[in-house]
Amino acid sequence: MRNKILDFSSVKAFLRQISEWGQGGTTEYGKQIKKHLSFQREYSFLHNYEEVSIDAVAKQYFHNPFDYIFNMHLNVVFFHAFKSYSNGFHQQLELVKAFNSTVLQVIKNENWFMPFCCQFSKNLVVLAKLLARRASNDQVKIKAIFQEAADVILQCYKLCQADLQTHAMNSKEIGLLSLLNCLCELYFKLGQIDDCNECIEFIMKNNSLFDIADNADKVKYKCYCGQLSLLKWNFKEAEECFTFALKHVPEQYPRVRKIILKYLIPTGIFLGKVPSKKLLETYDLMFFHEFTVALKNGNICQLSNAIESNGITFARLGISFLLHAFPSLCYRRIVRIVARIVGSKIIPLRYLYCAFALSTEGVNVVSFPNFLMTNIVDNCDKWNEFHCILINLIAKKNINASISTADNTLVLNDSTSFPSLTEATYTNPLFLEELA
């Protein structure tokens, strides 16, 4: 069996080859078919096609229901090629429904068709996203599109889940991870994090499902696990997931590696790890350099500018909630700088107040040791805000310290004044309503 992608001169040649592979009746042949069902493949032979001829040719090479399924597939490809996304989306919905009812539910103890079942689901997600873009800012319509796609794929997922067996040789479970990735992509867009979490927990309890999956599906799955860990504020677990994904993406796919790095880099920053400038330059991610420089310098003003100018980028990644926690890292850094300059575990609050104030004005605290001699006029509101910041740093365990109101000092613990960031606790703004 050849693994390369073939070009076809006609509908007849395409369907004849798919039919020959299908007669092999193994998942390897199924995977070969899958490669030729993606929208990324060349379907130049469709430019002069007649709808009637596809139906007739499909009946020559396939028995029911596959004649109907591949006929629909080529119709969808045509709609996609000519940007008729609404027609394509609704036709693809019917295709996936038909595959579920006439193949998954009917053909028992076989799984050779699962690879292209998964590809049909991926195609549905692609069309859902394209159609959603056409909906502009109509959030009700966009949600309806994603929900409709998710509901159809979920039915396939549940049926395969019910086919879970001790030996996966003939089980439909081999498609679970790929179907889960489709669901997670839609659930994240819908904000249905609990549904996504439920699917991922099922895979975690059945590790063999991960082991038997293709590398590409493993990478996508780990990315979704990483995003879910970020929402739970578990940076260590998120780092492990994104690192796995990055290591398993070949270097010839720089675009995919760049997407993963957009998640891995901020995750690493919250663990106290600064990316090299070379890495940022290689993948055109220098906007992260603004954050790392500001944090290193203890410059709140510079950090605020970085947050403001890159808010949209973080929002597109679905991690804008991380922006709320960057100031805490910077204030922690300032406390550490001041403690080193003072050379004592007991720091007068006026020194910290002065450092915080200068930082908000754009001064690099790390390179301005003379702030101890700077006189700043006290402002009641700013002093109260300063106190709140310190209390939050202590409450979140960013620093192990206490405030002495008797002599207006911050008293750092003798043991670990600045705990590892992996041990620090944060409050995710997304879950405030649940905690209230």
Give the label of every model feature segment.
Residues 119, 123, 178-182, 217-224, ...:
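"A position-specific structural signal for the A-helix of alpha-solenoid helical repeats
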Residues 177-181, 205, 212-231, 235-247:
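Internal alpha-helical scaffold/solenoid segments in large eukaryotic proteins
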Residues 1-115, 135-136, 150-158, 162-173, ...:
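Charged, E/D/K/R/S-rich low-complexity terminal regions of large eukaryotic assembly subunits
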Residues 194-201, 236-240:
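Short sequence/structural elements of tandem HEAT/ARM alpha-solenoid repeats
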Residues 185-191:
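Interaction-prone helical segments in low-complexity regions
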Residues 123-130, 156, 182-183:
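Alpha-helical solenoid cores of large eukaryotic proteins
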